[in-house]
UniProtKB/Swiss-Prot annotation:
GO MF annotations in UniProt: undecaprenyl-diphosphatase activity
PANTHER family assigned to the protein according to its UniProt record, in alphabetical order: UNDECAPRENYL-DIPHOSPHATASE
Other comment: Bacitracin is thought to be involved in the inhibition of peptidoglycan synthesis by sequestering undecaprenyl diphosphate, thereby reducing the pool of lipid carrier available.
Catalytic reactions of this protein: di-trans,octa-cis-undecaprenyl diphosphate + H2O = di-trans,octa-cis-undecaprenyl phosphate + phosphate + H(+)
Species this protein is from: Thermoanaerobacter sp. (strain X514)
Major localization listed first in the record, in broad terms: membrane
Entry's family note: Belongs to the UppP family.
HAMAP family for this protein: Undec_diphosphatase
Gene Ontology CC entries for this record: plasma membrane
Main function: Catalyzes the dephosphorylation of undecaprenyl diphosphate (UPP). Confers resistance to bacitracin.
Name under which the protein is recorded: Undecaprenyl-diphosphatase
Length: 269
């Protein structure tokens, strides 16, 4: 029962943070430390429940996704959409495959997460102040291949735990001339292949070794993350049409500084 409660908590954390620019991985690491949810299963669990969150995006955009898949002839709207998503997916996929083992062994710690949270917060503030009002693209369908590649390169930053995939791609979109809303929507679509790939890699490494209780915990986390993420996606895009990203940046700064203090006092290791 204790494991299932922890899975429920982690599912809520994943769903709340996956599509906000505050780092789901960073929060999962931090919360996992506090509730003593760590180890090999926890590491895989944290990646696999992302599938629940990404399915929330698939469900939310189901009409647009199904419409795009009906016509994938070269030159069609559907083909162009997924080609641009594929181009943006490549940089993080390649570098992630080459570095994932090192990242898992050396960078999954509260201190590194804190540094990434703070660095990402500063970048968000600077980029929004510099490029936030200069956008020329207010619809993700108008993004071209070069801009897709720029967003994909920006996504590489998210390989560092605590940086946030959502924050990285939204910042990349703003640098490419997209509005915050268009950048966020592109980020949601880019999350589909990116997170499916990360989940598949994790499954191949350790899925068969799970016990019945661990399977149950995974199901609880999956369902919880799906429902929570669906709520967040529904509210986040409308929020971006009226508000700034800075509240998320300030939150990141506060959490990052707090984590450094907790690590310094050896309350969290």
């Amino acid at each position: 029962m204790e494991l299932l409660i922890k899975a429920f908590i982690m599912g809520i954390v994943e769903g709340l943070t996956e599509f906000l620019p505050i780092s789901s991985t960073g929060h999962l690491i931090i919360v996992g430390k506090f509730i003593h949810f760590t180890g090999n299963f926890a590491t895989m669990f944290e990646i696999v429940i992302q599938l629940g969150a990404i399915l929330a995006v698939v469900f939310y955009y189901r009409k647009k996704i199904f419409a795009s898949l009906k016509n994938l002839k070269p030159g069609s709207w559907g083909f162009n959409l997924w080609f641009k998503i594929f181009i943006a997916f490549i940089p993080a996929a390649v570098i992630g495959l080459l570095t994932h083992k090192y990242i898992e062994e050396h960078l999954f710690s509260p201190f590194t997460v804190a540094i990434a949270l703070i660095a990402g917060a500063i970048m968000m503030i600077v980029i929004e102040d510099t490029f936030g009002k200069r956008y020329k693209i207010d619809n993700m369908d108008k993004v071209d291949t070069k801009k897709s590649l720029l967003i994909g390169i920006a996504q590489v930053m998210s390989l560092f735990p605590g940086m946030s995939r959502s924050a990285s791609t939204i910042m990349g979109g703003m640098l490419a001339g997209l509005s915050v809303k268009a950048a966020a929507e592109f980020s949601f679509f880019l999350a589909i292949p990116t997170m499916f790939a990360a989940t598949t890699l994790s499954l191949l490494k350790g899925f068969s070794a799970m016990s019945l209780l661990e399977w149950q915990a995974l199901a609880v986390g999956f369902i919880t993350s799906f429902l929570t993420a669906l709520f967040v996606v529904d509210k986040f895009l409308p929020y971006l049409t009226r508000h700034s990203l800075k509240p998320f940046a300030y939150y990141r700064l506060a959490v990052g500084v707090l984590m450094i203090l907790l690590v310094a006092e050896k309350i969290v290791k």
